């Protein structure tokens, strides 16, 4: 397991957002002082895919493989969702990822959030962010993916 100091050092190595994990010793990835902008998420994914940090190839490959979602028309979709909750309400949704093909790689990050004026019964979560991302990627002709009904 990674202790607080190791986690802070690793976040510094990969330049993860503001690197501030002081407000929550064990849950810093949740709604806390650790923040990151979508463009920083895209930069992080580019560095991860290229292993610019010179981490163990096996570890990097394992992380990337864990992000695999689907193949379509010779393209592979990789992604990760995230949901921030406060008072049992989903207030922050993320979907970050990339698409690989023979011609090009595409990186993306979508963040949605609820404001104080939003209807309390709506939700900003990772699933919603992923649906928005995939709709945009489809509209741009980059990747066609359809969610299967549950």
Go through the PLM ranges and name each one.
Residues 1-3, 42-150:
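Structured C-terminal helix/loop/strand segments within mature extracytoplasmic catalytic/sensor domains
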Residues 1-50:
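Mid-domain, small-residue-enriched loop/turn segments at the edges of structured enzyme/sensor domains
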